[in-house]
């Protein structure tokens, strides 16, 4: 039986569980690594990974309300709205009150936003590629599939 850690000679009553074996810790570290790579590769554009995701979602959807975009990028509406306001201030998106629902705002890419997204694409893809660079191509595909499986099964939690 593994010896239980003690502090000041007091038995803590738990077996050690190294951080490097904890899924939550590893996911957080991988996220930190990816954000650092994204910022390194995309620094010239002054866009965060979240803003890039929102621009990408709008490129696919054309027009979408803020609630839909929040769901697309798996964030709460408040955080999403703040990011959209910053993109709007830089003229990368348009936000307008919807005619059918005065409480909702419809968003769409501007020509500037579409051009930015196009210019960023190579650098952003390089950040994603470099995040998984230590894995073989087959392991990269397997890793993505495993992450998709976990998100599909438990995505409702957040």
Regions found by a protein language model. Give the residues of each.
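Short, locally clustered residues in the helix-turn-helix/winged-helix DNA-binding domain
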Residues: 28-31, 56-60, 121, 148
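Residues within the alpha-helical elements of helix-turn-helix
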Residues: 57, 72, 90
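Charged, amphipathic alpha-helical coiled-coil/dimerization segments
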Residues: 3-6, 35, 63, 85-148
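N-terminal leader segment of winged-helix/HTH proteins
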Residues: 1-45
